[in-house]
């Protein structure tokens, strides 16, 4: 068996797909930078190490999520992320 | 930039290397199975999602670590791991 990995934004974001005990997920790392992500499913994004500063859909302000914190994003929307230190995250899809 | 990823045990363990705010680290996924890891540095292993049942160096019993729990391993030793569900982990090296 081999886990599938994916790269985005010219390799600045890299993730490995896996099947958790409950939901499909990806485990990934983001380099320093700013990104806009599009969702295909409802997402539970947890910061594992580092921090993500996020502008959620419909929001006007940015909110920073640190290690251990989770934010949720609806399916079929976009959200913006600013990364100031290489950050590890876990995303579970519902 | 592109993050370096590595595979072990015929792809049953896959990780991405990154530089956290404090220490170098890897973020990885283990498939169901049993593995013996050799350490080159002092390791802080944190279970991100799933569980790892571990026999630490010199130990006779196995201990299960769940999501959010961390175990530490000296450099230049081996430790055994049993994985019963695909498990995501973070390893920081000192």
Curated annotation (Swiss-Prot), chains A, B:
A GO cellular-component term linked to this record: cytosol
Tell me where on the tree of life, at the top rank, the source sits. Bacteria
Residue stretches spanning the membrane: none
Q: Which keywords are on file for this protein?
A: Glycosyltransferase, Transferase
- The yes or no answer to whether the keyword Glycosyltransferase is present is yes
Q: Name one Pfam family in it.
A: Ppnp
Q: Catalysed reaction per UniProt?
A: a purine D-ribonucleoside + phosphate = a purine nucleobase + alpha-D-ribose 1-phosphate; adenosine + phosphate = alpha-D-ribose 1-phosphate + adenine; cytidine + phosphate = cytosine + alpha-D-ribose 1-phosphate; guanosine + phosphate = alpha-D-ribose 1-phosphate + guanine
The record's listing under Gene3D superfamilies reads: Jelly Rolls (2.60.120.10)
Q: What is its EC number?
A: 2.4.2.1, 2.4.2.2
Q: Which GO terms describe its molecular function?
A: guanosine phosphorylase activity; purine-nucleoside phosphorylase activity; thymidine phosphorylase activity; uridine phosphorylase activity
InterPro entries in the record, alphabetically?
Answer: Ppnp (IPR009664), RmlC-like_jellyroll (IPR014710), RmlC_Cupin_sf (IPR011051)
Q: Could you tell me which PANTHER family the record lists for this protein? A: PYRIMIDINE/PURINE NUCLEOSIDE PHOSPHORYLASE, PYRIMIDINE_PURINE NUCLEOSIDE PHOSPHORYLASE
What this protein is reported to do is described as: Catalyzes the phosphorolysis of diverse nucleosides, yielding D-ribose 1-phosphate and the respective free bases. Can use uridine, adenosine, guanosine, cytidine, thymidine, inosine and xanthosine as substrates. Also catalyzes the reverse reactions.
The entry assigns this protein to a family as follows: Belongs to the nucleoside phosphorylase PpnP family.
Listed name of the protein: Pyrimidine/purine nucleoside phosphorylase
- Please name the taxonomic classification of the source: Bacteria, Pseudomonadati, Pseudomonadota, Gammaproteobacteria, Alteromonadales
């Amino acid at each position: 068996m081999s886990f599938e990995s994916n790269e985005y934004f010219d390799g600045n974001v890299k993730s490995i797909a896996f099947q958790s005990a409950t939901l499909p997920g990806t485990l990934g790392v983001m380099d320093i930078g700013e990104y806009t992500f599009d969702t295909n499913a409802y997402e539970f994004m947890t910061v594992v190490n580092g921090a993500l500063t996020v502008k959620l859909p419909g929001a006007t302000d940015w909110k920073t999520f640190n290690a251990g914190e989770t934010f949720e994003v609806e399916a079929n929307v976009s959200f913006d992320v600013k990364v100031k230190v290489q950050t590890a995250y876990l995303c579970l899809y519902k």
